[in-house]
Amino acid sequence: MIKTILVVCIGNICRSPMAQALLRQALPGVSVISAGIGALSGYPADPSAVEVMAQHGIDISEHRAQQLTGSLVNRADLILVMGGAQKREIQARHPSKTGSVFRLGEMEQFDIDDPYRKQMMAFEDALAMIQRGVDAWVPRIRALG
């Protein structure tokens, strides 16, 4: 049974907060948290991420970045990352969690590009890819319990 999902990106201000919000919406009984491998703790979500999510009726304006820690990793039943490099880094740092770390795009074999400091179109593209990943994961997570 998956009780806690940890979503990870680099800064925890663009992709992972968007994925966290979508997963929370789709899986109300599951605790979904997010963190960044290189996050500046306390920073708000990127204004473009807030805007693109608001266009889809989801408010992430209260999000604050947090640094990925061993405690967060150990607490998670499933860790979803945006790309292969993040997956490898977490697996190397936390070998006991290797079997719990997957890309959000694992099923369709895609990574989600970082839209940070890019045009709004990059955020829209990232959100579309995140939604594809969430849509692929949600039935599998529900099937586990």
Curated annotation (Swiss-Prot):
InterPro entries tied to this protein: LMW_PTPase, Ptyr_pPase, Ptyr_pPase_sf, Tyr_phospatase_low_mol_wt
Gene symbol of the encoding locus: epsP
Annotated signal sequence range: none
Pathway: Glycan metabolism; exopolysaccharide biosynthesis
Protein's UniProt name: Probable low molecular weight protein-tyrosine-phosphatase EpsP
GO BP term, pick one: lipopolysaccharide biosynthetic process
Membership in a protein family: Belongs to the low molecular weight phosphotyrosine protein phosphatase family.
Pfam families, sorted: LMWPc
Keywords of the record: Hydrolase, Lipopolysaccharide biosynthesis, Protein phosphatase
Record's catalysed reaction(s): O-phospho-L-tyrosyl-[protein] + H2O = L-tyrosyl-[protein] + phosphate
Molecular-function GO terms, alphabetical: protein tyrosine phosphatase activity
Role according to the record: May be involved in assembly or function of the EPS I polymerization/export complex and/or the EpsB ATPase. Alternatively it may function in the removal of the terminal phosphate from C55-isoprenyl pyrophosphate in order to recycle the C55-isoprenyl phosphate lipid carrier used in the synthesis of polysaccharide repeat units.
Enzyme Commission number, as recorded: 3.1.3.48
Catalytic center residues: 9, 15, 114
Top-rank lineage group of the source organism: Bacteria
